[in-house]
Regions:
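Bacterial Sec-dependent N-terminal signal peptides
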Residues: 1-13
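Sterically constrained small-residue positions within well-ordered secondary structures
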Residues: 2, 99, 125-126, 136, ...
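Alpha-helical and coiled-coil interaction segments, frequently adjacent to or embedded
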Residues: 127, 155-289
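Secondary-structure boundary elements
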Residues: 13-89, 95-104
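Generic recognition of cysteine residues
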Residues: 9, 90, 101, 108, ...
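Short capping loops/turns at secondary-structure boundaries
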Residues: 87-90, 125-127
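Hydrophobic/aromatic-rich core segments of domains that either
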Residues: 95-174
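Short charge-dense sequence patches
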Residues: 10-16, 44-54, 127, 176, ...
Length: 289
């Protein structure tokens, strides 16, 4: 009873997005990689020296993102098979995270929905769900996580590159790239429709890394003029743009005032392809011409 009371007070007094996860991360990243584990054994090993739920959620997430590679060679949601092969697609990542969380006594659900990853997806009608991610509960509050996108990048070959942006992602950010099939998982006061979602540009994690608060969401299909306006607590030193096929990016002129930053671009001549918008060297939006 005493432990439960301490745990409750501990959880309510912290912001999970600002918590120091170094202990949990160290456990996850230093467990021997060559050894084969069952879901039960691995979960116990990872969580046995952690007292708080917030750290248990994290240690499982970091182990999965550090040890499971994205590969179409294993499309199953069989979690034991994912563990043995160490490869999966989104279904396997989400299923494994859910199974391990539940083994540790943590609340976790898998969310099915639609993800936009390429500029060709802009404006394309959604017919069949193509992505899976998770929702977890900390101190009675729901948080969104995507182990697949956090693990790295895939462009014909998986490149391991952990991205913190997809752990406890704010709903206002995740909805720009992830549309849940069940709207209750949007966790927004105003729900986003399918018609609105498909018009969004492709959104990269630079949006979250730069802590950008958008004045409005630009359309994903480029017209002759593009405007982006946002505020942020970060210092913005540069903005760039690059068309598909360009070898180098083009510096963009922007202005700033007490309300934030603004950039206005004109495209008098456009051919088919894509355009990527960068802020502080990080990709933020992908547009379709």
């Amino acid at each position: 009873m005493f432990f439960s009371f301490v745990e409750l007070c501990f959880s309510q007094d912290i912001n999970p997005r600002e918590f120091d996860y170094r202990k949990a991360d160290s456990i996850a990243l230093h467990l021997p990689k060559s050894k084969k584990y069952s879901v039960d054994d691995l979960t116990i090993l990872l969580t046995k020296n952690l007292n708080s739920d917030i750290e248990k959620y994290r240690v499982i997430f970091r182990w999965i993102t550090d040890n499971i590679a994205y590969s179409f060679s294993n499309k199953t949601g069989d979690v034991e098979k994912v563990l043995q092969k160490r490869v999966a697609v989104c279904m396997g990542y989400a299923a494994l995270y859910q199974a391990m969380c539940r083994k540790a006594g943590l609340e976790c659900e898998t969310v099915q929905g639609f993800a936009k990853i390429a500029t060709d997806d802009i404006g394309t009608k959604l017919t069949k769900t193509n992505h899976s991610w998770n929702v977890i509960t900390i101190s009675g509050k729901s948080f969104l996580v995507d182990a697949t996108w956090a693990a790295g990048n895939y462009n014909g070959k998986f490149v391991k590159d952990y991205d913190e942006s997809y752990y406890l992602t704010e709903p206002r950010y995740l909805i720009l790239s992830h549309l849940p099939e069940d709207s209750k998982y949007q966790f927004l006061d105003t729900l986003i429709s399918t018609e609105t979602f498909i018009k969004y540009p492709i959104v990269y994690s630079g949006l979250m890394k730069n802590k950008m608060n958008l004045k409005f969401i630009p359309e994903g299909k480029l017209k002759k003029e593009l405007k982006v306006q946002f505020s942020t607590s970060e210092t913005i030193s540069n903005m760039y743009g690059m068309f598909d096929g360009d070898k180098i990016s083009t510096p963009l002129e922007f202005t700033s005032d007490k309300n934030g930053y603004q950039v206005a671009l004109k495209f008098p001549f456009m051919s088919k392809g894509g355009y990527t918008f960068f802020v502080n060297g990080k990709a933020v939006f992908g547009f379709k011409k």
